[in-house]
Amino acid sequence: MPIGVPRIIYCWGEELPAQWTDIYNFIFRRRMVFLMQYLDDELCNQICGLLINIHMEDRSKELEKKEIERSGLFKGGPKTQKGGTGAGETGASSIQNKKSNSSSFEDLLAADEDLGIDENNTLEQYTLQKITMEWLNWNAQFFDYSDEPYLFYLAEMLSKDFNKGDARMLFSNNNKFSMPFSQMLNTGSMSDPRRPQSTNGANWNSSEQNNSLDIYSPFRMLANFEAQDYDFKQINPSLASKEEVFKLFNNTILKNGGQRNNNMSKLLTELAQRNWENKTNSQENLYKSTEKALSQRNLRKEYIKDRTLNNYSSDPFNTKGYVNAQGASTGPSPRTRGMHADGSLNYLDFYSYNDSYNDFKTAPRGKQAERAFQEEESKKVFVIINSFGGSVGNGITVHDALQFIKAGSLTLALGVAASAASLALAGGTIGERYVTEGCHVMIHQPECLTSDHTVLTTRGWIPIADVTLDDKVAVLDNNTGEMSYQNPQKVHKYDYEGPMYEVKTAGVDLFVTPNHRMYVNTTNNTTNQNYNLVEASSIFGKKVRYKNDAIWNKTDYQFILPETATLTGHTNKISSTPAIQPEMNAWLTFFGLWIANGHTTKIAEKTAENNQQKQRYKVILTQVKEDVCDIIEQTLNKLGFNFIRSGKDYTIENKQLWSYLNPFDNGALNKYLPDWVWELSSQQCKILLNSLCLGNCLFTKNDDTLHYFSTSERFANDVSRLALHAGTTSTIQLEAAPSNLYDTIIGLPVEVNTTLWRVIINQSSFYSYSTDKSSALNLSNNVACYVNAQSALTLEQNSQKINKNTLVLTKNNVKSQTMHSQRAERVDTALLTQKELDNSLNHEILINKNPGTSQLECVVNPEVNNTSTNDRFVYYKGPVYCLTGPNNVFYVQRNGKAVWTGNSSIQGQASDIWIDSQEIMKIRLDVAEIYSLATYRPRHKILRDLDRDFYLTATETIHYGLADEIASNEVMQEIIEMTSKVWDYHDTKQQRLLESRDSTTSGADTQSQN
């Protein structure tokens, strides 16, 4: 099946298999991509497969070309300059190297460096140099360089860097001495009768040797010889008597503080040369040597001049300027680049004569340049777009795949480029993105919630603005209805200005952007459990059901009571109590009763025997209701704890149990549930929640719901989360501060200026723990507490009877006043004092009756004035927040009313792209950079404009940077001509390939016939 073929072509059927080859060549070889349908996984994979194949093909050709160049077959080596020190020499060399690097391998076929002679020569030099140096290093241990001066000279020469320009001059510019090498080494006496003598004994190289006083001989002998590395007096003791040889050096060095530098070396070299010339026998020899050097230089100049003039026989001095192939003047011609103003050649630039040839090699020439241009254009990919979008992930994939194409891509939107398809349009090469005049481009606005929403995490309910990537957020699986805690993939925050959708009912309170996806059921059938993500604006004024329950699929958890070390007897011996695994149902019942109305205490008592103090660790559980007391006694017996009942208190003296429960005894305002509670199964959560209701004061509002009160905000949030794990729902509400409260422990009313958290629970959803289920407690008949305001007493009269951790209050006025405009303030104090009661807050948690069908209906009449039960659009300006996470649904609450809602990532929309594109321009390594890098739009303009789903005309698309030009008739004609040239090129190339195959086949057939 061809790659990147639209589905409409699939309808051609399989009875024409030959057509598939032509379609493949049309798509792959001609590099045409059609995006003309919903961008699903199948089409995305086909298109990206095409683009990756194109990239790999281009890349393989590039690697082949680089491999050819690296092999040295068509690559020339660097030229070593063999003379001349002109000022233009370096510039000419760099220009020549630059041009040589830009030459194609076809041009190099006619170049001097085709055979790579310089590379081979250099390689041989390095090889011989390395071999010889290894031999010298090995044999140096058997001889002394002072005895073998020629070996020393050889070692010095081999240590030179042959890449330097002076490598072949056999002397170094940094030499400190220029005296004859034989006078400095122990090669015999200076008065050796076998040595030719001069009148002053200094000239050992006489004219009789017929070398015409080669002026470089002393420097060759002293090549790379550093004076500071050797002690000449030790090398040749005979030099000790010749102090005049060193006076020329020592005096000058001492004047400069004994330091050598380049200027000093130059001075010493000149002095040594002058001293050597003064001691020569005859000026005639010196004259001959100078004349010889001058003649050689003049001869070279004449030779270069003749060669240059022969090459430029026509218009040899084109001083008017040179016009390149593009028609632009580039100043003096390469022919006159090495000339003076009078037209004479600058012979110090020995490579100026070769500039014309280099220019000839690199200038674009006819068919070769046209073919290269055509090959480069043929690598471009043409993407034709007419799509309503699709998966944002697939849109990102197509966009990124277009970036692989080195030659670039041309994108053309014909009808619609919506949502994720706009990513493909923006992914084209900037400057080559076109839209037709009637085309529409659609991008999504950001979708999020305001900062007064809280999100359920493993840390409890936290503001959405405080959620981080490290938090585990409650998410819902839409297929199974199961909830889990997972890390969000992204957290979003950006400024928003525009209309917001607000809905308020008895169980729902949300304030979101109009395109935020609500997780609702739009049918009237209560048995229909199919919930979908629908934009908030589309449900305005309609009857929908929100989902606020979930399935908590966990296995039963086994709690382990930790071991404890105990100091026993007067011997101060330490004994440890091993950890125990209590029976879970009994433990959950006990823990719920104790956390509701229990506390711990430690008492030091003196023993009668030795009058020493003994610590007694007590766990106390307080309860006044007899039915609940029966459950407490059954639970303690099953757990194996010894207890003593004294009135309303059950006392358990057990250090191991006390050690575990004592950290939770921090006062009523600081209650919380431990972490192991969130590992319980759904059934275990029901048992714990039921025991909490048994232990605390419960006010029965009707036969279906129970109200649980607590002064701890954290504990109220934990109860709400526990209710969700148990399979039901909860709603936390703020109530007005009551004036008369009732203490069920002391059985008397108290007057405090405070509010409480109230939990209203459906009693039919749970059963009390009992050995006989038939004796399940009827909470509505036994736990109802009513307030008689007439018999109220003051708090001062009963404060001594109130336990700090078991103070549970109800109020005489059951009317709830929901306060949506204020948030609960956290109370961090440990003890429940009068001041704390005055400053604390009262909240109510509502738990619905039927956990299986706990949907909340929102019936809205848009014609009625907006009230707390209506939905409406409200203008808003400020920050908004959202999450992108797995399963696309997370648990959120506002003003204590929790529901499941959609997040900012869903298959089929590119909304999350625009959420991050509000941060454009932070240039993060994020997918959202797609739009920011393609549009070049500043952040404040994006924020101002993206307040709706953005349907852009062709002009607006260009204005906002998603495209570069309107594809008018003229532009379309240019695109057609461009594609026609590319198609013709590929047709010609394909035809040549077929002809070569035919010729090969015909030749094989002829041979077989013969």
Curated annotation (Swiss-Prot):
High-level lineage: Eukaryota, Viridiplantae, Chlorophyta, core chlorophytes, Chlorophyceae
Domain DOD-type homing endonuclease: 590-728
Main location, first listed in the record: plastid
Catalysed reactions, semicolon-separated: Hydrolysis of proteins to small peptides in the presence of ATP and magnesium. alpha-casein is the usual test substrate. In the absence of ATP, only oligopeptides shorter than five residues are hydrolyzed (such as succinyl-Leu-Tyr-|-NHMec, and Leu-Tyr-Leu-|-Tyr-Trp, in which cleavage of the -Tyr-|-Leu- and -Tyr-|-Trp bonds also occurs)
Matches recorded under InterPro entries: ClpP (IPR001907), ClpP/crotonase-like_dom_sf (IPR029045), ClpP/TepA (IPR023562), ClpP_His_AS (IPR033135), ClpP_Ser_AS (IPR018215), Hint_dom_N (IPR003587), Hint_dom_sf (IPR036844), Homing_endonucl (IPR027434)
Annotated stretches, region: Insertion IS1: 60-377
EC class name: hydrolase
Subcellular localization: Plastid, Chloroplast stroma
SUPFAM superfamilies: ClpP/crotonase, Hedgehog/intein (Hint) domain
CDD domains in alphabetical order: Hint
Compositionally biased region (Low complexity): 90-100
Pfam families listed in its UniProt record: CLP_protease (PF00574)
Domain topic, free-text comment: This gene contains two large insertion sequences (IS1 and Ceu clpP intein) that divide the clpP gene into three sequence domains. Each insertion sequence forms a continuous open reading frame with its upstream and downstream sequence domains.
Record key words, sorted: Autocatalytic cleavage, Chloroplast, Hydrolase, Plastid, Protease, Protein splicing, Serine protease
EC number per UniProt: 3.4.21.92
Subunit structure: Component of the chloroplastic Clp protease core complex.
Active site: S419, H444
GO annotation terms (biological process): intein-mediated protein splicing; protein quality control for misfolded or incompletely synthesized proteins
Chain positions covered by the region annotation Disordered: 73-100, 182-209
Entry protein name: ATP-dependent Clp protease proteolytic subunit
